[in-house]
Every structure is written in C-alpha cells, then in structure tokens.
C-alpha cells in the first residue's frame, strides 16, 4: 500500500461591503508541505482594501494578509497575498497542520466609509 501524505482542508468564506459579492472556490485540500492557493474574484476598485483572515474552530479570526499583499509581523512568511486585476490570491507555501482553518476574504470599499 502506497503512503499518502495527510491532507489539510482550507475552507474559504467571504465577506464584503460592496453590492456584488466576490466568487470563490469553497474548499481547497492540500498535502502537508505543499503550496495552497485560495482565490477570490470580485469587483474591487481603486481605493478598496482587501484582507484575508484565518479562523480556527472556537477562536476569533486572525488577520493574515492586509491591503492585498501585506503580512503582519507575527504571521509566518509562508503566508503571502497577491492581486492581479480583479483576482486576489492567498498563498500558503509549505502548508503546515496548524494552517487547517477557515479563511475569510474581506473587500472594503474605502469610498463607502468616507
């Protein structure tokens, strides 16, 4: 019997304050140590803020990426974010067991808050 590496299941949920919500893949499975990519497509606009949060069962959400690609200092370097056109991507390079969680994408239209 061949050895199969354990899989992590990363679930994506979204939140948005714009009228047309983003679309996304509902779940991603990845083997330990492999790269995981979670993408969202939405009607982002200049001046909007895009954030990614990680939430584990029974815990509060933790900001892992802000302004599309910036990472808080306490977040491991394996987490990164990127944006191309209207697609925003969260990448986990070398996924670890502790990365199994729900991931939330948030798009905030800065014009709506002024």
UniProtKB/Swiss-Prot annotation:
Region of interest: Framework-3: 70-105
Q: Which UniProt keywords apply?
A: Adaptive immunity, Cell membrane, Glycoprotein, Immunity, Immunoglobulin, Immunoglobulin domain, Membrane, Secreted, Signal
Residue segments, region Complementarity-determining-1? 41-49
Principal cellular location given in the protein's record? secreted
Do the record's keywords include Ligase? no
Q: Where is this region: Complementarity-determining-2?
A: 67-69
Write out the GO biological process terms: adaptive immune response; immune response
Q: Provide the Ig-like domain boundaries.
A: 20-114
Q: Where in the cell is it found?
A: Secreted; Cell membrane
Q: Where in the sequence does glycosylation occur per the annotation?
A: 86
Region: Framework-2; residue ranges are 20-40, 50-66
> GO CC annotation: what is one?
plasma membrane
Query: For the region Complementarity-determining-3, what residue ranges are annotated?
Result: 106-114
SMART domains given in the database record: IGv (SM00406)
- The signal sequence is 1-19
How does this polypeptide assemble, per the annotation?
Most probably, the immunoglobulin is not assembled due to incorrect folding of light chain. Immunoglobulins are composed of two identical heavy chains and two identical light chains; disulfide-linked.
Function per UniProt: Probable non-functional open reading frame (ORF) of V region of the variable domain of immunoglobulin light chains. Non-functional ORF generally cannot participate in the synthesis of a productive immunoglobulin chain due to altered V-(D)-J or switch recombination and/or splicing site (at mRNA level) and/or conserved amino acid change (protein level). Immunoglobulins, also known as antibodies, are membrane-bound or secreted glycoproteins produced by B lymphocytes.
Q: What is this protein called?
A: Probable non-functional immunoglobulin lambda variable 3-32
Q: Which gene encodes it?
A: IGLV3-32
């Amino acid at each position: 019997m061949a050895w199969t590496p354990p899989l992590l299941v990363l679930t994506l949920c979204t939140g948005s304050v714009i009228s047309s919500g983003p679309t996304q893949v509902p779940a991603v499975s990845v083997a330990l140590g492999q790269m995981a990519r979670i993408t969202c497509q939405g009607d982002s606009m200049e001046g909007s803020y895009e954030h990614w949060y990680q939430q584990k069962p029974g815990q509060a959400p933790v900001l892992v990426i802000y302004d599309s690609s910036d990472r808080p200092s306490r977040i491991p370097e394996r987490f990164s974010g990127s944006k191309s056109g209207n697609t925003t991507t969260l990448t986990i390079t070398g996924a670890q067991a502790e990365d199994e969680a729900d991931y939330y994408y948030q798009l905030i239209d800065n014009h709506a808050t002024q």
